[in-house]
Regions:
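S-adenosyl-L-methionine
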Residues: 1-43, 116
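Conserved class I S-adenosyl-L-methionine
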Residues: 44-53, 68-69
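A short SAM/SAH-binding and catalytic strip from SAM-dependent methyltransferases
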Residues: 188-203
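Conserved beta-strand signature within the Rossmann-like core of class I S-adenosyl-L-methionine
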Residues: 192, 218-230
């Protein structure tokens, strides 16, 4: 990723509170990834997933994706993802990992957190400098109290497995969903966009979703959460418009598109 964060711009964006490249990140997902990822193809070699809280790529690896690339509109999402990967690599136990996330949600100066030195030494230098420059600003105070979502964290067995399989940071693309299809040239067996389409204007939903189709290999899938009503119709319209796609699930706020050839 060629993006170089600017702490002055980040301060201004966070003060305004609008969606931006520096929007605050969640520390724990509120999505049941154990449920969602049962719909990932069993032989997934390559997956592309939104970062969110960093849990999406971790669980994609846990559920069998051999190579995982990531994207998000916010650089702070990359930061929380890399912090989690660094925690795994530095040998934090599950209790300390959970406590770190709860503290990240509430604190402004993360340089004083327990175990943070172990984390910092494993982060990219540019990211380390950014976090130090932003140490008086809350970067991860997003959403509700993360302890409400503790059930979505890895359990002891899953956490131990992640320590074994996550050996390096995930590749990251900083991008709005509407530009993602133009920025990525690789193709994938599974693309997980979660609930991003809740934030795409209704009249743009079909076009934006269509732009992602070229990222998917034959027999691959796109998973879309549809808490808002319009992503479901857009998924059905994709299947009606493109004869190499089918809409195979619309249940529990999940839509799945599958490329059949």
């Amino acid at each position: 990723m060629n993006f170089v964060p600017d702490s002055n711009i980040a301060h201004n964006c966070l003060c305004k509170g609008a969606f931006s490249q520096y929007s605050r990140a969640y520390v724990i997902t509120n999505e049941d990834l154990r449920y969602s990822l049962q719909f990932m193809p069993k032989e997934t070699n390559r997956a592309l997933t939104v970062v969110g809280s960093g849990d999406h790529p971790l669980f994609a690896s846990l559920y069998g994706a051999k190579h995982v690339d990531t994207f998000d509109i916010s650089y702070n999402a990359k930061c929380i993802m890399d912090i989690k990967v660094a925690a795994l690599q530095s040998g934090l136990d599950l209790f300390d990992y959970e406590q770190m996330l709860y503290e990240l949600f509430y604190c402004r100066d993360i340089t004083g957190l327990k175990n943070i030195d172990k984390i910092y030494e494993k982060l990219p230098s540019v990211e380390y400098k950014y976090l130090c420059d932003m140490k008086k600003v809350s970067l991860f105070h997003q959403g509700a109290n993360p302890q409400l979502y503790s059930r979505f964290l890895p359990n002891k067995r899953e956490y131990g497995r992640l320590k074994d399989i996550v050996q390096k940071p995930y590749t990251f693309v900083l991008s709005d969903i509407k530009d993602l299809g133009a920025k990525i040239t690789k193709t994938y067996d599974f693309v997980h966009v979660s609930n991003i389409f809740d934030y795409v204007p209704r009249d743009k939903s079909f076009d934006v979703l269509s732009s992602l189709l070229k990222l998917v290999n034959p027999n691959g899938r796109i998973l879309v959460h549809n808490q808002m009503v319009w992503s479901g119709p857009s998924c059905r319209k994709i299947a009606e418009t493109f004869n190499n796609w089918r809409h195979i699930k619309e249940k529990d706020n999940i839509n799945i598109l599958e490329r059949i050839r």
